[in-house]
UniProtKB/Swiss-Prot annotation:
Residues engaged in binding ATP: 181-236
Binding locations of Mg(2+) 2: 327, 329
Native species: Mycobacterium bovis (strain ATCC BAA-935 / AF2122/97)
Similarity comment text for this entry: Belongs to the D-alanine--D-alanine ligase family.
Domain ATP-grasp positions: 153-360
Reactions catalysed according to its record: 2 D-alanine + ATP = D-alanyl-D-alanine + ADP + phosphate + H(+)
Entry's Gene Ontology molecular function annotations: ATP binding; D-alanine-D-alanine ligase activity; metal ion binding
Protein name, entry field: D-alanine--D-alanine ligase
Pathway note: Cell wall biogenesis; peptidoglycan biosynthesis
GO biological process, one term: cell wall organization
Binding residues annotated for Mg(2+) 1, in chain numbering: 315, 327
EC primary class: ligase
Amino acid sequence: MSANDRRVRVAVVFGGRSNEHAISCVSAGSILRNLDSRRFDVIAVGITPAGSWVLTDANPDALTITNRELPQVKSGSGTELALPADPRRGGQLVSLPPGAGEVLESVDVVFPVLHGPYGEDGTIQGLLELAGVPYVGAGVLASAVGMDKEFTKKLLAADGLPVGAYAVLRPPRSTLHRQECERLGLPVFVKPARGGSSIGVSRVSSWDQLPAAVARARRHDPKVIVEAAISGRELECGVLEMPDGTLEASTLGEIRVAGVRGREDSFYDFATKYLDDAAELDVPAKVDDQVAEAIRQLAIRAFAAIDCRGLARVDFFLTDDGPVINEINTMPGFTTISMYPRMWAASGVDYPTLLATMIETALARGVGLH
């Protein structure tokens, strides 16, 4: 094989310090199964919940949910390593003691399959920019904005895009008064402001439930957002940047959760998503063509409004008055049930092609200011 024919070396980075560690592992397992080994030389770097980087054996079978048991990157499961924040090192991953400084691998591009804080929020993107290593997905700004539900809504609203009503509790305040939320009406959803996978989310149907819901959310994030419940269909759309910088939007998907587990107040929570297999996912969604196209265009506008790059999943409610944007996920789930790859498959882009496009776009973009 000539130098021009050599495979692109991709580091799939997963796990991390957030409470979405396990879902990141499952996403990584799915990606490892679907990367084209003829084109890509793949290494797998796990980050433990404590933050140590470990070179793993890239076994996707170890990164699955089995009998409701969640996967985890464990200390001692491989050689500990680091990525020096030095662009002169050319993407080198070096060992930590013993053998400190030994170059273990050199990579061309990083696929940071990290969900939640300390990964999806601009932190690893900043490290990769400092290290001069191209990476899949949004840059520092869009990653940070997309992780914070408050600032996502603020930027979208400033660009004239439809968002729901909300209230925010920020440190050092410890309580959110009922009067601040009454304008939202009931029910409301109380969430960690910088989190995903529906972890720490509560549905509040009585104001007496608000303090407990805030306390639950604060176990995951000191900043809490309270969102007005929106009556409508839950729709999602994938946005994908091509290597030439053009943007494409996928067919839509719909999540239906009414009556899940026999509860009238059910919503698409963590257990429904990943453990119970209880929600119904329709891909493509059964939506009028004109409405679907309008939502796809809104997804592209939202992507541009936060200066996103690479990919994103934009979540909507379709109400009687039209679509409302709920949030933007700059590194959506890539599990076998995740909507993002399923929507692109329904659009005619299979999983290996989708992953290859993301990597090609990352290499074409490079690093630095754009």
